[in-house]
A protein has these predicted regions:
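Periplasmic-binding protein-like
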Residues: 29-31, 105-109, 193-227
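A ligand-binding cleft/hinge motif common to bilobed small-molecule-binding domains
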Residues: 84-94, 145, 174-202, 207
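Acidic, polar ligand-binding/catalytic clefts
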Residues: 50, 63-125, 138-139, 201-208
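Short helices/loops that flank or line small-molecule/ion binding pockets
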Residues: 68-80, 98, 161-184, 189-190
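Ligand-binding cleft/hinge of the Venus flytrap
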Residues: 49-58, 100-102, 125-127, 135-159, ...
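Extended ligand-binding regions for polar small-molecule ligands
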Residues: 46-55, 116-117, 123-130, 212-246
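Extracytoplasmic small-molecule ligand-binding "clamshell" domains
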Residues: 21-94, 157, 226, 245
């Protein structure tokens, strides 16, 4: 009888180890729909890292912060991973860790009301206009953008993309700068909520180029596994399905 109990306990222990998972806390900006949607714990970025790591035995735990605070929480090791990191961000914020391969790409545009009649060809043309961007854009984009923004007395940043939409259509600013998917999402949301009329025509200027991003890990082993699984998602076609879902 004692032997039977011992065998049962060993079997349960083995089963427990097989099905055990390691929780990975991941910091996300809290206002980046459809890339990050805190209310439903999904979105393009969340789905990518979840579907990459969970088959490898990791449980992704999303934690949402005002955009710049995700960096502070990562630096202080309150989280294991931070989203929305590139080489510029690591350099400007003096971050240590292991950066993943490019995992997703923002398409940032300058948006202006068509009635303004702007014909922007270069981002330097924004230097004397009121421009509302997203929090951390100077560090993240860097280079010519950082120079233009730093020298522009009418340049501001916010961690609320919804407020960018409102300010543009209320004619409080000349230009807003943000990702095209985020703009379209919050434009529709603001209109549906009856907050501001967003039906006025808008011009979109691709002045900034694509902004590739990845995840910054404290643990190299987990970063390496993520890179392998990310490639699997891309090779299988699942990555494209995630992008198209939203």
């Amino acid at each position: 009888m004692l032997l039977k109990i011992l065998i049962t306990m060993l079997s349960l222990g083995a089963a427990s180890s097989v099905y055990s998972v390691e929780e990975i806390k991941v910091a996300f900006g809290n206002a980046l729909a459809p890339w990050v949607m805190p209310a439903t714990n999904n979105g393009i970025i969340i789905d990518i890292i979840t579907e990459a790591l969970e088959p490898a035995g990791y449980k992704v735990v999303p934690i949402y912060y005002p955009y710049l605070r995700r960096i502070t929480q990562y630096r202080n090791r309150f989280v294991d991973v931070s989203s929305d990191i590139n080489v510029n961000t690591m350099t400007e914020e003096s971050l240590a860790g292991f950066l993943s391969d490019d995992a997703y790409t923002y398409e940032n545009f300058a948006f202006a009301l068509k009635v303004k009649g702007y014909k922007f060809k270069h981002l330097n043309e924004l230097g004397n206009l009121s421009l509302l961007s997203w929090q951390g854009a100077i560090a993240h984009i860097g280079n010519e953008y950082a120079q233009m923004a730093t020298n522009n007395p009418y340049y501001f940043e916010t961690n609320r993309q919804e407020s960018q939409i409102q300010m543009l259509f209320l004619k409080r600013v000349d230009v807003v700068q943000l990702d095209e998917k985020i703009f379209d999402y919050f434009r529709s949301k603001v209109e549906q909520n009856g907050i501001v009329d967003t039906t006025e025509e808008v011009d979109r200027f691709p002045l900034f180029g694509a902004s590739s991003n990845g995840f910054l890990f404290h643990d190299k082993k987990i970063r390496d596994e993520f890179n392998r699984q990310l490639q699997r998602l891309k090779d299988s076609g699942r990555y494209a399905e995630i992008l198209n879902r939203y």
